[in-house]
């Protein structure tokens, strides 16, 4: 059996020759950025594919999050999860907003709605949940709390491309949803991101903010930044869309194989599927319990020695990093579930090019063979 390196993910790259005509078109257009034709085509194509009304493309998902907060004029305190990539909380700090961490649900690993109300103060202006691993948050419960307290809801939907619940795209919930199109994501544009928004007026404000606040040659309406996606990134996204359904099918096959082959291994708990009608199989997290022969870190090292590079997403918690750990909400006794999960979680390799031999190699290693 092969011993080649297997990483937790690998960017999906369509055949290079299929990308060349897009590049030729860009060269002919002589437009490289500033909302050119590829950018416009991708926005329209994504609205159609995702089933949303309005989407604004960005150069990355973090700038999209930063701009979403600016677009809604969020200030004060925002309730969020400690169990995410650091960009979730960093986007708050960069906007001068105080993140307030709330514990996660032990089954979904998303923000626990039953813990939110106790964290609300007079300074709270919004909730920023994360659809962790692409599993939908309890959007109804979160929205009910937001409505009761007049709070905004901004979803960090970096993992949730293409995910649907019974009513359609999960991205339609809340005031805004921010996506990441980073190379590690299910759908990528090398680097990129987007904000899904409910109406044309909000999209116009977002478009202004991502272009320095410029409206026309003589009018600047806000202190914006440069968050624009280039034509090359947008073109790659258009090509990716032609392949995304096929890529999702392979991800689902890998997910189902893991679930079937690992379900009876003592000490491995598979994170439950989120109840969504359409999943994107972006990650495959497992929890290593006390009755497994190795603890999580020992298994992580064993796999690494075998050239299998799983990842401990998300360890450490955001709340453990120096810029956050002094906050009252970051204290471990406030986040018992998140701390326990962070000490047990391991995300296994999942990507369309992962072949069955390497999949079997991973499973056999987990079985102790």
Regions inferred by a protein language model and the residue ranges of each:
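Active-site PLP attachment segment
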Residues: 172-208, 231-234
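N-terminal "arm"/small-domain region of PLP-dependent enzymes with the aminotransferase-like
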Residues: 1-32, 349
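Phosphate-binding glycine-rich loop
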Residues: 31-77, 83, 91-94, 101-103, ...
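PLP-dependent aminotransferase-like
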Residues: 70-157, 164
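PLP-dependent aminotransferase class I/II
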Residues: 37-45, 49-53, 114, 118, ...
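Short, conserved catalytic or interaction motifs in soluble domains
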Residues: 60, 104, 132, 183, ...
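Conserved active-site segment immediately N-terminal to the catalytic lysine
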Residues: 155-189, 216-221
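Structural detector of well-ordered beta-strand residues that form the stable sheet scaffold
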Residues: 56, 79, 100, 153-154, ...
């Amino acid at each position: 059996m092969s011993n080649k390196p297997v990483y937790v993910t690998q960017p999906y790259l369509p055949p290079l020759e299929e990308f060349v005509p897009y590049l030729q078109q860009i060269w002919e257009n002589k437009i490289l950025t500033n909302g050119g034709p590829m950018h416009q085509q991708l926005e329209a194509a994504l609205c159609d594919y995702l089933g949303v009304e309005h989407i604004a493309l960005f150069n990355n998902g973090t700038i999209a999050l930063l701009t979403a907060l600016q677009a809604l004029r969020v200030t004060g305190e925002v309730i969020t999860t400690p169990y995410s990539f650091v960009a979730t909380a960093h986007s708050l700090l960069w906007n001068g907003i105080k993140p307030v961490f709330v514990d996660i649900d032990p089954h979904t690993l998303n923000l626990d709605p039953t813990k939110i109300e106790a964290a609300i103060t007079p300074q709270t202006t919004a909730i920023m949940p994360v659809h962790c691993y692409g599993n939908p948050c309890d959007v109804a419960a979160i929205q009910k709390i937001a409505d009761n307290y007049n709070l905004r809801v901004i979803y960090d939907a970096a993992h949730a491309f293409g995910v649907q619940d019974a009513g359609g795209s999960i991205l339609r919930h809340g005031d805004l949803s921010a996506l990441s199109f980073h190379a590690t994501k299910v759908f990528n544009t090398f680097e990129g991101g987007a904000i899904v928004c409910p109406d044309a007026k909000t999209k116009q404000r977002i478009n202004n903010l991502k272009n320095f606040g410029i409206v026309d040659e003589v009018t600047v309406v806000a202190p914006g930044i440069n968050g624009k996606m280039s034509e090359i990134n947008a073109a790659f996204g258009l090509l990716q869309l032609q392949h995304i359904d096929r890529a999702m099918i392979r991800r689902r096959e890998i997910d189902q194989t893991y679930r079937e082959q690992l379900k009876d291994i003592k000490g491995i708990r598979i994170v439950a599927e989120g109840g969504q009608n359409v999943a994107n199989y972006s990650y495959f997290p497992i929890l290593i319990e006390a009755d497994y022969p190795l603890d999580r870190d020992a298994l992580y090292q064993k796999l690494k020695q075998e050239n299998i590079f799983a990842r401990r997403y998300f360890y450490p918690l955001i709340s453990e990093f120096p810029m956050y750990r002094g906050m009252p909400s970051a204290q471990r006794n406030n986040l018992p579930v998140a701390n326990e999960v962070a000490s047990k979680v391991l995300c296994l390799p999942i990507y369309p090019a992962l072949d069955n031999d390497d999949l079997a190699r991973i499973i056999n290693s987990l079985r102790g063979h």
